[in-house]
Amino acid sequence: MRTTKKSSKKGIPLNLMVVGDVGLGRTAFINTLCEKPLIRHNNNFDPAEASSVSPVEIVPYQTDIILEDGTKINLTVLDTPHFGEAIDNENNFDIILQYIESQYDNVLEEESRIKRNARFCDDRVHALIYFISPTGHGLRELDIELMRRLAPRVNIIPAIAKADSLTAQELQTTKEMINADIEYYKIPVYDFPYDIEEDEEAIINLSQQLRATIPFAIVSSDRLIEMNGQTVRGRAYPWGVVEVDNPRHSDFLALRSALFATHIEDLHNITSNQLYETYRTEKLSTSQLLLDSTVGLDGKNLSQHDQVLREDRLRAIELSVQKEIEEKRRQLLAREEALRALEEKLAASTAAMANASVSTLPSSVSSTNHSQS
């Protein structure tokens, strides 16, 4: 593992996806992570939408994070509203997986071009923070299925949401049970890998500490509280204050430091050199791009005729891959259009209900008020 960051005036890109059930504090976590109100809290409950279940959406938010040493992080946070609302989340799994793979497809398509696009934007997801409900137990079937399906494509970092709802003993027990489930179901979560022969002792110790912290106990809050003459981010309770940035209360600070500083390069390397390369190999294999060697045992080159045939075949397969990528992109655009249409329909329905409720007020209300005056 390497932690040396290349300085760049443009900044270091980091694409981070946050997944978790409604009510687990995704918005609060993202705002706390970015130290700014990047996303509005949705406190408006609409009864008209309570009975309807919307598919998960993937909503990007972009901001710059400036670290204490002046390093600039070009952060893209991908929020996932509506995840976990449905009883059957199979469709939601597919939407998230399809999004992650579509970013790999974009890179694969760019690599296949003879003339590269100098302004190509690499949107591959470097890490996925998965929020686990603080039930005091281990993983649910939903948690297991999602992490098992996505782990081969993205660095998954499990976290216990709203950890301040558990006592210290409950939290420790919950961590042990979750880790036991991760090991039992062989879920390859991101475990802060290190090379004991090449990495410095300080890096090895840090990685071991972070590995022992999994799953991260997260407390999020963008509220500032005065305590002992100091201003802290936290949550106030009758029995005291839980501080977001206090390592004794929350693992938030350790996670933020790992994402933005100590392990950002490692997340990049694993995404590019392992996860993407695995996907690329699978993609090219299914497209029959991994051709059998046509060089003879004596090591002689192909004949000119065979070379021409091989190049023609490669071009044909390349066109097939590009068409498949374009088709997947069209499907994503169609899904986004359907989601927008659904949102407009729900908004129109809500407005119609509001107008109907006003127009159906009893006439006796206004006449009574008139008589009293």
Curated annotation (Swiss-Prot):
One example GO MF annotation: molecular adaptor activity
Coiled-coil residues: 311-357
PANTHER family for the chain: SEPTIN
GO BP field: cytoskeleton-dependent cytokinesis; mitotic cytokinesis; protein localization; septin ring assembly
Superkingdom of origin organism: Eukaryota
Modified residues (Phosphoserine): 303
Keywords associated with the record: Cell cycle, Cell division, Coiled coil, Cytoplasm, GTP-binding, Mitosis, Nucleotide-binding, Phosphoprotein
Region described as G1 motif: 20-27
The protein's name: Septin homolog spn3
Any Gene Ontology CC annotation: mitotic actomyosin contractile ring, proximal layer
Transmembrane segments: none
Record domain Septin-type G: where: 10-286
Organism: Schizosaccharomyces pombe (strain 972 / ATCC 24843) (Fission yeast)
Cited function: Plays a role in the cell cycle. Involved in a late stage of septum formation leading to the separation of the daughter cells.
Cellular location(s): Cytoplasm, Cell cortex
Record-stated family: Belongs to the TRAFAC class TrmE-Era-EngA-EngB-Septin-like GTPase superfamily. Septin GTPase family.
Chain sites annotated for binding GTP: 20-27, 162-170, 235
Subunit structure: Component of the septin complex composed of two copies of each spn1, spn2, spn3 and spn4.
